Amino acid sequence: MHMHFGAEEMFFVLSGRPVFRNQHGEEEMAAGDFVFCPEGRAGLHTFSNPTEEPAQILAISAGSFPDVVAYPEHGYAWVATRDPDPELLARGGDPGIITRFEIPIE
């Protein structure tokens, strides 16, 4: 799971049956379902797709940069200075993602 300290996120399920997980548990979702994740600890979340059916989710982020994205289960965080460039990420890096910090996150 991860959380943002610079952005809120909204997710709208377009198809499939993805599972949304946050600090309160898991919920299977379906087309038409919506979830809002606020900035900070209250917005801790992740999705999975335990079925063989493809799932599509429209993700909308609203925030500012820099954005610190923390992964408390793994003990690291990213700092982003802007939206990542998908083409640069596919080639192994993006200068908009400054660095990954190995830090204890509680």
What kind of feature is each model-predicted range?
Residues S48-E106:
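Double-stranded beta-helix
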Residues M3-N22, I60-S64:
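Short, conserved beta-strand element in jelly-roll/cupin
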Residues M1-H4, P38, A42:
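Conserved short histidine dyad/triad with adjacent acidic residue
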Residues R17, Q23-R41:
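Short acidic-glycine-tyrosine-enriched beta hairpin
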Residues E9, P18, G32-F34, V69, ...:
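Short non-domain terminal segments
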Residues L44-T46:
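Short beta-alpha junctions and helix-cap segments that line functional grooves
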